[in-house]
Design a protein with these regions (language model features):
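N-terminal core-binding DNA-recognition domain of tyrosine recombinases/integrases
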Residues: 5-20, 26-86
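A detector for short, charged/polar N-terminal pre-domain segments
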Residues: 1-2
Length: 86
């Protein structure tokens, strides 16, 4: 996924998020990238709400709790905001 490494560096160095938070965002974005790859999507501009909902549903069925799902959504939102600025 385009810009993922730069985004994580931005979180660590410019936003000064804790290493644990950056690691959690990395895992969340990895899960997001895996979900997109399942649909043959490698360009973040091609993502729509159905892809995100599919990921949320899948992660919920895998036992991810509500707070973790909220963090996943936050990671995705933050990633897209970062891409819009870049």
């Amino acid at each position: 996924m385009r810009g993922r490494t730069a985004f994580l560096d931005y979180l660590a160095h410019e936003r000064r998020l804790s290493p644990n938070t950056v690691a959690a965002y990395r895992r969340d974005l990895d899960a997001f990238a895996t979900e997109l790859a399942r649909h043959g999507i490698d360009d973040p501009r091609r993502v729509d709400e159905h892809h995100v909902r599919g990921l949320i549903t899948r992660r919920h069925r895998q036992g991810l709790g509500p707070r973790s799902i909220q963090r996943l959504l936050s990671a995705i939102r933050s990633y897209y905001r970062y891409l819009m600025r870049e």
